[in-house]
């Protein structure tokens, strides 16, 4: 498959992305909430449960993995990446190395991981990964985000994207504007717009093939400590921000859920697709908003596997329907 074919496939027909690339420490936090030990075997069992869910088929086009998972085998010896492929989804890999302060003492951060990235990508390509992901973090606060922060992260994302494409893998570029804080939806709109402008300028300057790239942005929402606004307002502001700042030849936008509840993430996505009138697919790349109910239902017990899989399958199906603009809250009744 070409880069363009891979990117288009991942978001085709309402399909989206299951973000299962939690680092081991983050996985530990999730497991703490259900009182399960954060062991290699438990991480494998949990992800095997997800990837064997019936609802993967037809609803999930790609799965983002952590390094460990790309190399792991299921209990019966089948590579986990093969379970993903068998469901009709493509395996992908998180390649960044986390956040460091932009400058000493700064509250702002930049993502590291460019050192040795070409070699890592070459290996991931040989292991069967079809796409990659790199997350940048933009904070809103006093004098934040600064131009320096936005530009440094845009450059790192563009450098990463060029390296991923040179190794035959689609880059997912993720400029996450954090919800943390009491900022207004207008400040969120401004931070997203500036991040998009800088990112696509940097991608173009680096010769990145936009048709073989996927954007994983935040939705335009008020800060988590601010009053919530109507679903329609989030949808309208987000669509406007994208239309004003994103090139039309980008194949897909796969939103992060960023601390939204499962239902909020689905409702917002649906409302945007009901608005319509944009050249790219608007889809999902959700972690917690796909996994939360499944994780709770599983709780580390093998006898709960089928109930947990039903939860994941349901959320995957609901989000596919939302990516087609056809979701309704009544569909949540089971």
PLM region spans:
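Catalytic core of soluble alpha/beta enzymes
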Residues: 179, 183-249
């Amino acid at each position: 498959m070409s880069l363009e074919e891979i990117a288009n496939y991942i978001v085709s027909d309402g399909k989206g992305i299951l973000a299962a690339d939690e680092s081991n420490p983050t996985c530990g936090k999730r497991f703490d909430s259900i009182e399960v030990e954060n062991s290699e075997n438990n991480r494998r069992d949990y992800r095997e449960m997800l990837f064997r869910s019936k609802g993967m088929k037809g609803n999930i086009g790609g799965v983002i993995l952590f390094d460990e998972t790309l190399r792991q085998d299921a209990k019966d010896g089948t590579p986990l990446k093969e379970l993903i492929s068998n469901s009709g989804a493509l395996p992908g890999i998180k390649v960044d190395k986390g956040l460091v302060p932009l400058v000493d003492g700064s509250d702002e951060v930049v993502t590291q991981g460019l050192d040795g990235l070409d070699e890592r990508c070459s290996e991931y390509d040989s292991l069967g990964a079809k796409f990659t992901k790199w997350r940048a973090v933009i904070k809103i606060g006093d004098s934040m985000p600064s131009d320096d922060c936005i530009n440094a992260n845009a450059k790192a994302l563009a450098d990463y994207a060029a390296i991923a494409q040179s190794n035959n893998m689609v880059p997912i570029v993720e400029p996450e504007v954090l919800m943390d804080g009491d900022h207004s939806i207008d400040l969120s709109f401004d931070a997203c717009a500036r991040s998009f402008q800088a990112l696509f300028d940097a991608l173009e300057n680096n010769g990145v093939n936009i048709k073989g790239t996927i954007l994983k942005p935040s939705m335009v929402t008020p800060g988590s400590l601010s009053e919530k606004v109507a679903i329609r307002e989030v949808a309208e502001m987000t669509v406007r921000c994208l239309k004003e700042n994103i090139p039309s030849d980008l194949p897909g936008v796969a939103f992060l859920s960023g601390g939204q509840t499962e239902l909020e993430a689905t409702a917002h996505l649906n409302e945007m697709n009901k608005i319509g009138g944009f050249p790219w697919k608007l889809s999902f790349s959700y972690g917690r908003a796909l996994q939360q109910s499944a994780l709770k239902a599983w709780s580390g017990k093998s006898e709960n596997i089928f109930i947990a899989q039903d939860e994941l399958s349901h959320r995957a199906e609901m989000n596919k329907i939302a990516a087609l603009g056809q979701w309704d809250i009544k569909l949540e009744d089971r």
